[in-house]
Amino acid sequence: MGKYKCKSVGIIGCGIQGVCIGLQLIKKGIPVTIFDRYDLLSSEFQSASYGNAGHFSPYAVLQFNRTDILYDVPKMLFSSYGPLALKWNYAPKMISWFLHHLKNCNKKSMLHTAKYMHQILSLSNDAYEEIFKEIDTTNLVEKKGIIYVWTKQNLKSRKLEIKVRNDLGIEQKLLTQREVLELEPNLKPVFDAGVVYEGAMHARNPHGILQAIFKLF
């Protein structure tokens, strides 16, 4: 069987994954067409990489199959300030997915996911840095790390995250209340502790980064 030669590639969606994959393919001499309902260079662009938090988070290895998430779901659903929303008329269609999700909410699956997420994410910042060398990231990217803070009420959940990341060798620094306030003096002294991930980056303008990368095509 002869070696397959790719003549061209079509990519659906010009979010951060789409444009980064497209750029790498173009560098290999493969013509690329990206399909999206919006023009990336227009002000009407509304893809997944528009208006999000914009964190480059190589530490984010724990996903939603963590063992303690089920205890938080009811509170998140019924709180008007919660991060989770559900269209109840769509709920019956989600039963199969939800049962599969429940099956994977166990320690073994959680650690399996975290292990392989770490293998991918540990390469992500270096991969982005290669691209950032080719664009002007002034006012687009901040390299200040990220701080998570919590109260004693949330301590059990945070201990789980810290242990899993520590076991995987992820660089993190635990903070006392005093150290949290030294780093973020505008916070009220209601948080008991925190952790800082100094290798994390933040996109000040995710849409601007997308446009800058796309202009390399």
Language-model regions, residue ranges each:
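Glycine-rich FAD pyrophosphate-binding loop
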Residues: 27-50
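Rossmann-like flavin
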Residues: 95-215
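Glycine-rich helix-loop-beta junction characteristic of Rossmann-like nucleotide cofactor-binding loops
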Residues: 2-3
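Hydrophobic/aromatic ligand-binding patch that stacks against planar heteroaromatic rings
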Residues: 20, 24, 55, 164
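Active-site catalytic microenvironments for nucleophilic, acid-base chemistry
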Residues: 24-28, 134, 216
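Glycine-rich active-site loop/strand segments that organize a redox cofactor
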Residues: 46-119, 139
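N-terminal Rossmann-like FAD-binding beta1-loop-alpha1 element of flavoenzymes
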Residues: 6-34
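Short, glycine/serine-rich, charged loops/turns that create anion-binding
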Residues: 39, 63, 153-154
